[in-house]
Amino acid sequence: MLMIPWQRAVGIGYQQEVIARLKNHTLGYSGSQINVTLDSSTDTFPLNQSLYLDFSHDTNIVSVLTAFGLRQFSQLLLPTEYPGQHNFTVTHVTPFGARLDIEIIRTPKPLAADRGGYLDGKETKYVHFVLNQRTLPLGWSMPECDAARVDGWCELEAFLRAQDKMPELARFDYACFGEYSPPEYGTVLDGVPP
């Protein structure tokens, strides 16, 4: 999934919009394909909503997942052999009518990674990615998130820290407009050109 050198750049605009909403601010500059004329005004980019609905073509989901840094789909699939068990099957990730839900969950106290109960502490917010009704474990891709969580959730603050570096990693201008030779198959594993 991450083998196309502009994959991360294609989805980074949506990633920036989601993060701006989570941080409750508009976007005056993005360094990507965002129309900041719309995203810089709360009239056209509303904030503090309990529900946002964004629509796109289902094939954009792969770029969006790459832009968010989800690496569990980055296994190199060789054209010469059957891969066996693997995490990326196009028909599962982007079927017709594919859906990506990003949920923010608030708990009265931190929730144990094994979901065995609450821990001591204050109210905690978590982010939960659901792709076609299946949880995407965020800890598999982001060291800031707890890989041991059985629910795949990530504490919201840890998730936001992980996401802060994603626009820079996308290298939007270079990926989309840079002059580079097409990389050999298997050399791009993170959605950006070498």
What are these regions (language model features)?
Residues 1-194:
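Non-catalytic terminal regions with compositionally biased, polar/charged low complexity
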